[in-house]
Amino acid sequence: MIACLDARMGEIYHAAYQKQDGVWHTVSEPALCSPQYLPVLEGTGWVGCGSGFDAYTEALQSAYAGQIKHITHGVSPHARHIASLAMPVFQQGRGVDASLAAPYYIRDKVALKTNER
């Protein structure tokens, strides 16, 4: 599964995962990138989802030509999805104390300056 979210400012949040034996494994770490410079993924049969596929359809289909078998439109991330990814990690004893948990920011710069617009 290739997840691409429109990050605005001409960029996307991109990550790829594969499910094996009921557990999701990261193939491509979450990253902020230009739709023209996407991570290379091996193989075929990928399913794409997220607002990035709506915003940058041509660039994503061109980059992954022949690799994506289906794009699911109208899917947005939800906390329950993250919880399902975290559960196996927690069960393996790799959880962290809630007081130490912190958000993972992919983009530090959240707005363009006036002269950059």
Describe the residue ranges of each PLM region.
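Surface "functional belts" at beta-alpha junctions
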Residues: M1-S76, Y105, V110-A111
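Acyltransferase
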Residues: H70-R117
